[in-house]
Regions:
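Domain-level signature for soluble enzymes in the chorismate/prephenate branch of the shikimate pathway
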Residues: 1-282
Length: 282
């Protein structure tokens, strides 16, 4: 079994993978495959290069990870979400040995940690430039390759694995920082007979999305059956300006008989496109 994740070694994605292998039905003998970008991870599942993969989908501060969402919506029609795992995040400021805090001229990291630590960076490093990297571990590699006084935002594990130094611990602006990761596969996990407990992720888009009340009509299919929505957001449909695809998470599995499945059938009557991204136990 080949399992993809956002690499290189030392990323929060690798930490989430290691902590949740058993939840995905995988053993310690799984072959883990680090990939350069989150889009690459999703594409590797779509193209059959890996059997399963884990990617970040949502953060408690910055919200949805658009790179992953767009990859699922537009570039991975055969990929399904089969599970999720929530990881507490503790980004640290990491440097080469001998670099002082006041010397730091540039901070590298994935865009999410840069945003999650924005207040700290403005306060402690107001003159430092912020440079996005493909991943937190890649940011540490950039620090070690530089002869300038630069830093990275990454996990303590990334510092330890690469021989770097943590100069400031837990620098996120919010104490309860967490990221929700999703497990992906080309083979959806079937619900047990009559099993309704769990979660489903659904995307949908118009026919009547330009009409007043259309979105209300769509969501009423769930409210009228007492199906709880836990998340909703929209992404551009990549057609005309102002056209969107909506994504929702709901409590309940739509691949087993019950209110969630009935609501999905009702939703289809209002839409041109409805796709179940995943229906899985939690």
């Amino acid at each position: 079994m080949r399992v993809g994740y956002l690499g290189p070694a030392g990323t929060f994605s690798q930490q989430a993978l290691n902590e949740s292998l058993k939840f995905a039905g995988l053993g310690d003998d799984a072959e883990v495959v680090p990939l350069a970008t989150a889009h690459d991870v999703v594409s590797a599942v779509q193209d059959g290069l890996v059997d399963r993969a884990i990617v970040p989908i949502e953060n408690s501060v910055e919200g949805g990870v658009n790179e992953v969402i767009d990859a699922l919506v537009h570039d991975a029609p055969d990929v399904a979400i089969i599970g999720e795992y929530v990881l507490a995040i503790n980004p640290c400021l990491i440097v080469r040995e001998g670099t002082a805090l006041g010397e730091i001229s540039t901070v590298y990291s994935h865009p999410q940690p840069l945003a999650q630590c924005a207040s700290y960076l403005r306060r402690e490093l107001p003159d430092a430039s912020l440079q996005p990297s493909n991943s937190t571990a890649a940011a540490v590699a950039e620090v070690l390759a530089s002869d300038q006084p630069v830093a990275a935002l990454a996990s303590p594990a990334a510092a330890e694995q690469n021989g770097a130094v943590v100069i400031a611990e837990s620098v996120a602006d919010h104490e309860l920082l967490a990221t929700r990761f999703i497990w992906l596969s080309r083979d959806p996990l079937e619900a047990a007979a009559q099993e309704q407990a769990g979660k489903s992720a659904i995307l949908f888009s118009g026919a009547g999305d330009g009409a007043p009340g259309w979105l209300l009509d769509c969501l009423s299919e769930f409210a009228n059956r007492s199906v709880n929505l836990t998340r909703i957001e929209s992404r551009p449909a990549r057609l005309e300006l102002g056209q969107y695809i909506f994504l929702i998470d709901i409590d309940g599995r739509v691949d087993a008989p019950g209110p969630a499945a009935d609501a999905l059938a009702g939703l289809a009557a209002h839409c041109e496109q409805v796709r179940v991204l995943g229906s899985y136990a939690v």
